Amino acid sequence: MPQVPGPRPEPRAGNISQVRIDTSSPEQTEALGRRLGKLLRAGDIVALSGDLGAGKTVLARGIAEGAGAAGYIASPTFTFIRAYRGAVTVYHVDLYRLDRPQQLEDLGLDELLDGTALVVLEWAEKAGPLLPPEHLWITIRFRNGDDTRAVEFLPRGPRYTDVVQTVARECASWR
């Protein structure tokens, strides 16, 4: 599938705010998402990246649950966007099937990023210039074994640095 041009943040050597947490099962990945979701609020943006099947939707489900979203959290692959109401409105966006920049405008992604809801973007590298400078970039990578994942947090901005440091402390026993 063609890629929509856009930034793909990569870790830089010496970036002390970057954190990696390894998870050993989908359940643990979802639990990590719940811990993260409890720290997030309306206006926050979480950008998820990783190979197909790496666990982006599993982590997104945990984030939405942790933020207080009601109901079953499902992948929006074919609907592109799912909205969940609760303590915080959560927009779960899946950009996997996008192949043209114009489709971002058609979806109204810029309107979703207006600060009124928590937005979780899967395949965030396709969001291109619509992704604001301050956000939380998370890359999920396959590790040794079928279920083991490396969840790499790269905060962009002081708010997200604080969030990541808190999650890292809470999950210190997982590393």
What are these model-predicted stretches?
Residues 2-6, 10, 14, 19, ...:
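Short phosphate-coordinating micro-motif centered on Lys-Gly-acidic
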Residues 30-39:
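Pre-Walker A adenine-sensing motif
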Residues 46-48:
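Hydrophobic anchor at the beta1->P-loop junction of P-loop NTPases
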Residues 56:
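Conserved lysine of the Walker
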Residues 73, 77, 83-123:
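Conserved nucleotide-sensing/catalytic segment adjacent to the nucleotide-binding pocket
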